[in-house]
Amino acid sequence: MTSILGDDSGSRLYWEFLDTGLAESAGMGSYDHLGCGGIMTYLCCSPENAQANMERLKALQQKIFDEGVTQKELDLAKRKIASRIVLASERTNTRMFSIGSQWLSGQKFKTVAQIAEIYESMTLAQVNEAIKAFPLDNSMTVVVGPKNDLQAV
């Protein structure tokens, strides 16, 4: 989901904010832990664009909740993720970290191919169900910068 919505290239945040020049950077990432986790969305822009961009982000989150993501977006995300997994597995420290993490969390060891297959097996319905189960507008907003008059959206 975060690859579709907030990846650094080709995501919805990219097209909404970076490609248009409304922000210097924007992205979304997931932080998963055993049994819990979170999603962080960040947006870096000029103070003059801050309020309008927060409103654009809110509208984008609502559109994602209402309409879900498309099969084309999911297919692209699967290819990106599989490529990242394979490329990262070429580094020894990444392979060792993966083995250690799986062992510490009590999981059976999975090969790179097995991990990639988990992502490949995700369906559009599953992704859209996750979006409904964990709405992006259920969040806290933190603002860093010179603006002290921003209104919550």
Where are the regions a protein language model picked out?
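His/Glu-based metal-binding/catalytic segments typifying zinc-dependent metallopeptidases
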Residues: 1-12, 21, 143
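M16/insulysin-pitrilysin zinc metalloprotease superfamily fold
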Residues: 7-9, 27-88
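A broad structural signal for short, well-ordered beta-strand segments within beta-sheet-rich domains
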Residues: 22-24, 136
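C-terminal regions of mature proteins
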Residues: 78, 82-153
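Glycine-rich, charged/polar anion/phosphate-binding loops
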Residues: 25-28, 126-128
